[in-house]
Amino acid sequence: YKHRILYYGPENVSEISSQLERLHANKTNLKQIPNKKEFIEGTMDKPMVYVVDYDMKQAEVMMLSKGDKVNIDDVSKYCQIKFHNEYFGGGMSSIVFQEMRESKALAYSVYSTYTLPRDTNASHYLMSYIGTQADKLSEAMIGMTELLDVMPEAESNMKNAKEAIEQKIRTERLTKSKVLSEYEKAQKLGINYDVRKDLYEAVQDFDMNSLKDFHNSHISSGTRVVMVLGSKEDLDLEILKEYGEIKHLTLEDVFGY
């Protein structure tokens, strides 16, 4: 099949090219790469709750909402997303982790992140995950919903988020195959430079208003779809009905076999 060759190393381009001419076989009559299967993103026009019955004591919950298509010309949004994720739901010092696990003990695992698509045909998604005991499902879902609806303001957390982003960029080194993989990811988005430069410069000027504006525009709004994995014997369906129409899925529905 037709292909490309990526190289990272000490040799210059002309030396590598001459070696490839000599050593690389199968350079002619190459087949076209088959078109990849396109998976169409579903619409989220009404609240739904998808439930999969699985024999387990815990409940796994994902609250999902769909955002806009990625816009490669709006690098400022990329910076806002990275800052909000770090502050709100991306790590152990985030608001979501501290509120849901540390303060209220409502989850053994929890996060909330606004995704960064890997190509220009994909949309942003807000993904908020809760791993909790089945008997804490109601409290956990209420707690997460409250955080999504109204973002708590904590100056110390905001400062830590800025410092974490700056420190990561200062110390992170892209070397060897990582250079190639990062280049490929950027190319898929139509970007021809290292956007971490923009992030490092932008985060200096971000403040609590920046976080609130992004949260109100992209997190608080939007139709939410809830996905729940757990034992149907332990899940309270009356509680789940409050979040949308319930649809039970079989393992065949999920995996296709």
Language-model regions: role of each:
Residues 3-71, 228-257:
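An aromatic/glycine/proline-enriched structural segment found at the starts
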Residues 93-94, 179, 253-257:
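A C-terminal, polar beta->alpha supersecondary segment
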Residues 51, 214-217:
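Short proline/glycine-enriched turn/loop segments at secondary-structure junctions
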Residues 2-8, 59-70, 97-213, 221-229:
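M16 family metallopeptidases and their MPP-like homologs
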Residues 35-36, 212-215:
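Short beta-alpha junctions and helix-cap segments that line functional grooves
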Residues 72-77, 137-140, 237:
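Solvent-exposed, non-transmembrane alpha-helical starts
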Residues 15, 23-31, 91, 104, ...:
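A generic secondary-structure signal for well-formed alpha-helical elements
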Residues 63, 73-89, 94-98:
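Active/ligand-binding-proximal structured segments within catalytic/core domains
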